[in-house]
């Protein structure tokens, strides 16, 4: 196996447990489109990169044809809604528990239910990540090219795929404004639990409080109140809705209209789902804190070194992971599946496996292409930011200047402040319904998604148009 047979899928910061759940979510659900027979996860120092083969991506793209069927669209939405509802019911039950009083077997039962909810949700969430919808997106773009003139196409494509409803990011900002100028720490932490999607890969209370206080101050400076915020947003969304209706009614192709509505809805829903895709670890943080306490290690150590199976083994039989193995996993670990055979390795064994799979190729990547998710033309300096956690985001904010072009593997809600300063956004991952695509259309800035390698071709400080 050599490197040109394996292609980038996505990259972000993960705990080891979350990485394991993603691995299961990508491989173990044959009833969900987008499963990968061949997949490689490499996690170095907490930042992982996922690869698969081009053949797998081509197959998954073909599988995506099922979404041309309106009945299947509804079936899929019903399935993912069920995933969310199951997670909510588990969380409601979890909040009433005194974890200290649970036996190890009772804690194991709770942990297993959490993992089951997480894996099923991730299996469904990955469908809209830019791999299953390309044929739908192509059909929509081709249809709009025929419908509108060349000068109108980009503007109307962006317009028709934009949501005119208040989304979860805006609801969170409204809620934060409603807390007033100087909310207490207790009130802010309650807010954090209600909108935990922002705290992906972030576990330190002090960092979370500082992040919310900074944002609260900025929102109050910009808007003064949630009433002013809503008036401004609603005015814009009313104009958007009126123009949408005007352009949408020009389209006579019923199939095209259905797919526009489906992709628009998927973009909005993927934001809503992030509360449980990106915020679930924070919501269940006390569960992980209790497990790490019983093991006798810090929360950070636990999340970076314990697999799902390790936690199950500890809670069932009391077996722990040796320090040497934990240290190896902090440096590098690998999940790999080829032809249905699964492997996990860490440390030197992981390095050997990566070299065996990818080879030592140092071929320089030069080609950059992607999907235009929001039209426009700008010139600016490149600033590469990787989605790890709030601590890293706050450090990146210090170096990101107004008008810089944001380049990242994929965007998360916790970099929204940076996205608002960007003159354009470029991502390795994603499609027309991705977070970057949706937010760029709301912000009215150009966006290119699904480049696969922008973070590896472009460099900080590069001036691009």
Language-model features and meaning:
Residues 1-465:
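Non-catalytic, soluble scaffold/interaction modules
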């Amino acid at each position: 196996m050599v490197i040109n047979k394996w292609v980038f899928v996505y990259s972000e910061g993960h705990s080891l447990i979350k990485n394991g759940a993603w691995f299961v979510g990508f491989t173990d659900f044959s009833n969900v489109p987008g499963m990968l027979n061949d997949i490689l996860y490499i996690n170095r120092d907490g930042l992982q990169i996922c690869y698969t083969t081009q053949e797998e991506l081509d197959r998954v793209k073909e599988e995506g044809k099922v979404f041309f069927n309106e009945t299947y669209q509804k079936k899929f939405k019903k399935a993912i809604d069920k995933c969310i509802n199951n997670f909510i019911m588990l969380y409601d039950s979890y909040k009433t528990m005194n974890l200290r009083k649970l036996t190890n077997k009772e804690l194991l039962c709770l942990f297993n239910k959490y993992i089951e909810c997480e894996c099923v949700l991730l299996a469904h969430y990955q469908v809209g990540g830019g791999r299953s919808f390309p044929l739908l997106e192509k059909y929509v773009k081709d249809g709009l090219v025929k419908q509108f003139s060349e000068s109108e196409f980009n503007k109307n494509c962006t317009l028709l795929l934009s949501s005119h409803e208040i989304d979860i990011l805006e609801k969170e900002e409204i809620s934060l404004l409603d807390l007033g100028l100087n909310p207490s720490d207790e009130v802010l932490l309650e807010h954090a639990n209600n909108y935990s999607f922002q705290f992906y890969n972030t576990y330190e209370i002090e960092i979370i409080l500082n992040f919310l206080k900074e944002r609260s101050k900025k929102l109050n400076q910009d808007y003064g109140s949630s009433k002013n915020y809503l008036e401004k947003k609603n005015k814009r969304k009313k104009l958007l809705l009126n123009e949408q209706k005007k352009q949408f009614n020009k389209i006579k192709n019923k199939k095209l209209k259905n797919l526009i509505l489906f992709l628009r809805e998927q973009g909005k829903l993927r934001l809503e789902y992030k509360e449980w895709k990106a915020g679930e670890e924070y919501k269940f943080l006390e569960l992980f804190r209790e497990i790490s306490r019983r093991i006798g290690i810090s929360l950070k150590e636990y999340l970076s070194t314990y697999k799902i199976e390790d936690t199950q083994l500890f809670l069932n039989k009391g077996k722990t992971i040796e320090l040497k193995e934990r240290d190896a996993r902090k440096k590098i670990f690998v999940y790999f599946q080829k032809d249905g055979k699964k492997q996990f390795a860490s440390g030197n064994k992981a390095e050997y496996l990566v070299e065996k799979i990818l080879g030592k190729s140092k071929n320089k990547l030069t080609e950059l292409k992607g999907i235009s998710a929001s039209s426009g033309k700008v010139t600016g300096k490149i600033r590469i930011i990787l989605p790890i956690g709030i601590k890293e985001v706050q450090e990146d904010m210090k170096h990101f200047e107004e008008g810089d072009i944001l380049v990242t593997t994929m965007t998360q809600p916790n970099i929204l402040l940076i996205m608002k300063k960007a003159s354009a956004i470029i991502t390795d991952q994603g499609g027309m319904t991705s977070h970057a695509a949706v937010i760029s259309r709301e912000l009215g800035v150009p966006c290119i998604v699904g480049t696969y390698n922008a973070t590896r071709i472009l460099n900080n400080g590069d001036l691009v148009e």
